[in-house]
Amino acid sequence: MELMGSSYDGDYNNGRMEGTGEYTIPTHTRYVGEMKDGMFHGKGVLHFPNGSKYEGTWEKGICKEGKYTFSDGLKYKETDWDYCDGKDRRFYSERCNGLKPAGESQLTDPDPPRVIPDGCYDTGDGFYDPNTRVVKGYDGNFLRNADDQEHEWIVLSCRKSLDEFTGYCPRASTLEEK
């Protein structure tokens, strides 16, 4: 297990994970809960590095039901989802704390927004480099390779770093021209 970058701290039975424990995978996602025959089985919570979590009920390693909560406390709903839709574009933190004054609008839910590396996109759980097609966590650790569908979604939907430096461009004042 350690050879693969995973670790487990918990109960064993016949050399297999069984009972309650904490299993950490190489991406630093942690499962805390019940195990049976080396698999997630029973109640458990997946804690993601970005602070979000998935609470579920598992059977033989397969999640049968669960609830996802984003790192800011927003709970995902499969139906009647009204977060950041066409009717209400506020971020969850703006819903909880109110809007900022004019001229100080938020670009992202985390405020101030993260600085995105050149040529990359902010995927919400890390940065995506379209040249390598790799998503790395905000800590720089590998998260995943993006398939064609995810690549297309990221390029169309996610916030991108600036491509070029525009520099300071003073506005001509009508008073100066007179």
UniProtKB/Swiss-Prot annotation:
This is MORN repeat-containing protein 5. SMART domains: MORN (SM00698). Pfam families: MORN. MORN repeats lie at residues 8-30, 31-53, 54-75. Keywords: Cell projection, Cilium, Flagellum, Repeat. PANTHER family: MORN REPEAT-CONTAINING PROTEIN 5. It is found in: Cell projection, Cilium, Flagellum. It comes from the Eukaryota. InterPro entries: MORN, Morn5. Its main location: other.
